[in-house]
Amino acid sequence: VDVDFRQMNAESIDLPDASVDVVFSSMFLHELSLKSIGRVFAEIRRVLRPGGLMLHMELPPNTQMGAFEGFYLDWDCYYNAEPFYKAFRDQDPRELCRKAGFRDDHYLQFVVPSVWNHGEAAVETAIAAEGHEVNKATTGRLSHGGIEWFGFGAWREAQS
């Protein structure tokens, strides 16, 4: 697999239209304002080839967490200089993708365990599983059983 890692302004990606197969970010979006996220998603959609994948590992949305778990995760917004943290977690990831022009039926969401706590086999099993529900006790937070990571994204529609 030919992989090209680049660091640049995600709101103004210096690549031609429809030129990449995958755009991936990890723990990035919650550092941005909602306005910036919209611009980033639009840029990602622009540079993705038809059938390309946008994928983000992020914090789980508040709508999929219980009240205590939401409070626990949102603590950083108030006491750890994370000003966009809660506003991001209050969003519906599917709607963020839809607003950027991704089709609703091309949205994907998943939860995978930490490879460091559970090993590669557990991650592969989680990826292959049906239904990726957020575990209120372990997704996005440290716990006795390790941590699970929330991910979401969308495929750009293939040209017909």
Model-identified regions with their sequence ranges:
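Conserved Rossmann-like nucleotide-binding pocket used by diverse enzymes
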Residues: 6, 24, 55
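Conserved SAM-binding strand-loop segment of SAM-dependent methyltransferases
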Residues: 2-12
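A short acidic, Gly/Pro-enriched loop at the edge of an enzyme's catalytic core
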Residues: 11-23
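C-terminal alpha-helical "lid/dimerization" subdomain adjacent to the S-adenosyl-L-methionine
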Residues: 55-119
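Core SAM-dependent methyltransferase catalytic element
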Residues: 98-160
